[in-house]
Amino acid sequence: MKYAFYPGCVSRGACPELYTATLEVCNILGIELDEDSLRSASCTGAGVLQEKNLRLGDTLNARTFAMAEKAGLPLMTICSTCQGVMSQANQRLVSDPEYLASINEDLKEEGLEYKGTINPKHLLWIIVEDLGMDFFHSKVVRKLEGLKLAPFYGCYIVRPTEALGFDENPERETSLEAVIEAVGAEVVDFPGKTLCCGFPILTINPKNSVKMVANHTIDAKDRGADAMVTPCPLCHLNLDGYQPNASSAAKRDIDLPIIHLPQLVGLSLGIDPEKMRLNKHIVSTKKLLSELAVAP
């Protein structure tokens, strides 16, 4: 399987370990990534641009879709925020031919045209739907038995459901749990798994953002979680990067490692943790890896 790879901004900047782990995992799973076709693609706007200029945001995403179309490839992302923003933009574009035509007028300058055939897809869904769980099971060489994991979807990969295709693909609602179970770990369910991590308000209300980090991580920890796994790099940035602040605010040492989805998958595939930069997180994964008898 070959995809036009849209890594998003964060995995090439603040979370390089996500990008590295993705390359390692896709290599073993037989997912071929074409980075060249989208090398000059723009940021999705992350929902922030859309609040100020919806048309500009849709134009940028239509440009990315047109590049993937030109390459003749489906589009894969590893960012839940990118997934959500792209899916919403795509819904607006394909549901309104006149609007799409006007956007394409802007794309003519680069010799591009979006025909409406792209369905942006997160790596999580590609594993569950395109590869299939039977295939994924066959690739698992290290069962992570005894590990208790709290899934954290965040906002953008679960809503709005109509833009994300949940009606046609109801398995997406529990896709993260399916992967956790497939690697042999135990799912620790908790109410906050589909709520906001707090990242969008970090710069305007840092106190509440840190409080949200504390609420989610403490709840998961108190329910027995050894770690939390997320398909969203922005959620990882907040839940991992600001967990020390959350610990200070809550006056307790939370110490809950936050794992990127590809890192979790990679551990089950036998990939060296150092290759996936699991030693580069703010909240140390050393104890977790030691308990799994995996060298940190």
What are these regions (language model features)?
Residues M1-P296:
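Iron-sulfur cluster-binding electron-transfer modules in prokaryotic oxidoreductases
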